[in-house]
From Swiss-Prot:
Gene: rssA
Protein name as it appears in the record: Swarming motility regulation sensor protein RssA
Molecular functions per Gene Ontology: ATP binding; phosphorelay sensor kinase activity
General function of this protein: Member of the two-component regulatory system RssA/RssB involved in regulation of swarming motility which has been shown to be inhibited by saturated fatty acids. RssA/RssB regulates cellular fatty acid composition, hemolysin production and cell surface topography. RssA/RssB negatively regulates the activity of SlhBA. It can also act as a negative regulator for the control of the swarming initiation.
Cellular compartments annotated: Cell inner membrane
Length: 469
């Protein structure tokens, strides 16, 4: 069973996963980098204030001055600086404790209850005192006469740089996901629009969709749809052309056979009947041959025409083809010859290549008068492939008609020999299928006509963007 697939859901899932990943990275950064750095920053502030007080006490002593008033003033200034840095006034109460060298408490801002007692070696850390948790940071100076500790309650510090629990993280995440749903839905609207454009078309409408009106991201899909419709339209046109050609070309021989059959019913003389039957046989043979050629041409024009690509010894295969036509050439008193490179091997479809050359050779023999010559030549173009040239010194074709030789059913005016006019069209289509080029050249002795099969070293199918030469 085919599973449910939704591009919308796929987009949402990937976006939500990306947001969750980024969200997790943000939380990890806040927890493991941002907050520890802020803790160090505030601890360092406390340590600087403690160092300042310790330095003053080292210089002035505690005997002759009101050191408690000095510490109280510094404490007030510190509280004011914190409050001034906040947008909203807070009830900020730090803890200031001063110890002498004997660890006696000389000053404590906590006037209620027992003052904070710490071991002599402690300058920083966290303690629970007076019902609250405190961050402690302190300092000795060079004389080590006085140890000053400045404490900040956990609650005050949380107020200073915010409590993560106060931020509605889940609410923000939910809002982001809902926003993603809306943006993904509206972002996919162009896909739904192009789907409607295609579904609203009439079945026979294969005209291309306007690509310039589409969004950049959808254009490749629309272009491929246009190419598909173009291929379907071309296939339809080929089918219509085949039906029209078949009906047109078969009408004449079939009509002739029907007329001869009607005449046969009225003739009683045996010799005349045999002549009519012979004419009927020729007409039926021509119709059968024409049908085969039409079918072959239709197969060639199909996109799925099968090819069997293999290494082909060109000289050997062309030699075999010429050898098969020698009896017919001898019968017509026509000289056949083959020369050129004997070591040419290319990768192509052997049957298609032989069919091309056979069509050309059949035409040359058909129109060659007695005593004429037909020469085949193979020229290596390694590593680019080879030329297979077939030339004769027969009647030839005038320049004005050469450009139409590869058209279907085209026959040079004034031609006496019978034929359907499909042979060269089939050869040209076969050449296109194997990536070769078939073109006209000059004949022998300033007469006749020639054809060149330009065969590449290896098979390379012709793409839609490559024009036919």
């Amino acid at each position: 069973m085919i599973g449910f697939k939704s591009f919308f859901m796929r987009t949402i899932i990937f976006q939500v996963l990306a947001i969750l990943l980024l969200w997790g990275l943000l939380v990890a950064w806040v927890k493991y980098w941002y907050y520890p750095d802020m803790e160090k920053y505030f601890d360092n502030q406390q340590r600087i204030v403690a160092a300042g007080i310790a330095n003053i006490l080292d210089e002035t002593g505690t005997d002759n001055i009101d050191y408690r008033g000095i510490i109280k003033t510094i404490e007030g200034m510190y509280i004011d600086s914190i409050n001034n840095g906040m947008q909203d006034e807070i009830d900020y109460h730090p803890l200031f404790v001063v110890y002498d060298r004997d660890n006696r408490v000389l000053y404590s801002s906590q006037t209620q209850g027992e003052p904070l007692r710490l071991p002599p070696s402690v300058l920083s850390g966290s303690v629970n005192y007076a019902g609250a948790n405190w961050h402690l940071a302190g300092s000795w100076k060079e004389k080590r006469q006085y140890r000053v500790i400045v404490g900040e309650s956990f609650n005050d510090r949380t107020t200073l740089f915010g409590n993560p629990a106060d931020v509605p993280l889940l609410g923000i995440l939910a809002a982001i996901i809902v926003t993603l749903l809306f943006t993904a839905y509206f972002s996919l609207r162009p896909l739904r629009q192009i789907a409607r454009t295609i579904s609203d078309r009439q079945p026979g409408n294969l005209s291309p969709i306007n690509v310039s009106e589409q969004y950049q991201e959808i254009r490749p899909v629309v272009m491929e749809v246009n190419k598909l419709m173009a291929r379907i339209d071309a296939a339809n046109q080929r089918e219509k052309r085949f039906m029209a050609d078949a009906a047109h070309e078969l009408r004449t021989p079939i009509a002739a056979v029907l007329a001869q059959l009607h005449l046969l019913t009225q003739v009683t003389e045996q010799q005349e009947r045999r002549e009519i039957i012979g004419d009927m046989q020729q007409g039926l043979d021509r119709a059968a041959s024409l049908s085969r050629q039409l079918i072959n041409l239709a197969k060639l024009e199909a996109e799925d025409f099968p090819l069997k690509i293999e290494a082909v010894d060109i000289y050997a295969e062309i030699g075999k083809c010429i050898a098969q036509h020698v009896p017919y050439a001898l019968e017509k008193d026509v000289e056949l010859s083959l020369d050129g490179s004997e070591d040419v091997v290319v990768s192509t479809d052997r049957r298609a290549l032989i069919a091309i050359f056979t069509n050309l050779l059949d035409n040359a023999l058909k129109y060659a008068p007695p005593g004429s010559r037909i020469e085949a030549n193979i020229r290596s173009l390694a590593p680019l492939g080879c030329y297979i040239t077939l030339r004769d010194n027969g009647p030839g074709v005038s320049e004005e008609h050469r450009s139409r030789l590869f058209e279907r059913f085209y026959r040079v005016p004034g031609t006496q020999q019978t034929g359907s006019g499909l042979g060269l069209a089939i050869a040209r289509n076969l050449a296109d299928k194997i990536g070769a080029q078939l073109r006209v050249t000059e004949g022998l002795d300033d007469r006749g006509i020639g054809f060149i099969i330009d065969l590449p070293e290896s098979y390379r199918p012709q793409t839609e963007s490559e024009p036919r030469p």
